[in-house]
From Swiss-Prot:
One of its GO terms (cellular component) is cell division site. The gene is zapD. It comes from Klebsiella pneumoniae (strain 342). This is Cell division protein ZapD. Its main location: cytoplasm. Pfam families: ZapD.
Amino acid sequence: MHTPVLFEHPLNEKMRTWLRIEFLIQQMAFHPMIATHADALHFFRNAGDLLDVLERGEVRTDLVKELERQQRKLQSWAEVPGVDQERINELRQQLKQSSSTLMAAPRIGQFLREDRLIALVRQRLSIPGGCCSFDLPTLHIWLHMPQAHRDEQVASWLASLDPLIQSLNLILDLIRNSALFRKQTSLNGFYQDNGEDADLLRLRLDLAHQLYPQISGHKSRFAIRFLPLDSEYGIVPERFDFELACC
């Protein structure tokens, strides 16, 4: 029985940022019912990391530009004979709506940034053990509030990210589905190829080999070296087949 493992690697800084944002939001939304101190620290640590990422660049501007770029790509696809025009028009409408919603939304993350509880916890997370009850009595009392109260507050925090989530999910879905997986073969654990202006590499490996990829490169060229999970006794086959999509 084969167990495929999917690896994704960004080929530019924009995609790297988007994948990090996606990961952090998934972590925040994974367990929205905060019932324990551990649940709270998991949520607030990821919320703080998300705000750090959002503060580093022009996320909204990059997303709007990408939404427009995807619309242009769909426009060119619409001229191809036999293409599903209904699906193309549906996607173009989704892109336009996401762009309008994102442009009209307040500064991304501002609702979280202005929340007093998030700000207090965020300040203490950099201190080892800094979220004890005597350090953060505000969090301690909040965790003793009714569960429904906490659920409502968490839901409002996540809802404030909806314009970002909607646009990002649409963009990443289009990029991920822009290329098919193709069988490739590495020689002595090494593979290289041209990126052809790709934004994202997606690799599928069989878990049975217990190998993982170490990827370097950019949109025009990339290299992949396969390494064994067991660095001492693991073996890399002379010829190793895997699946690759350059998106």
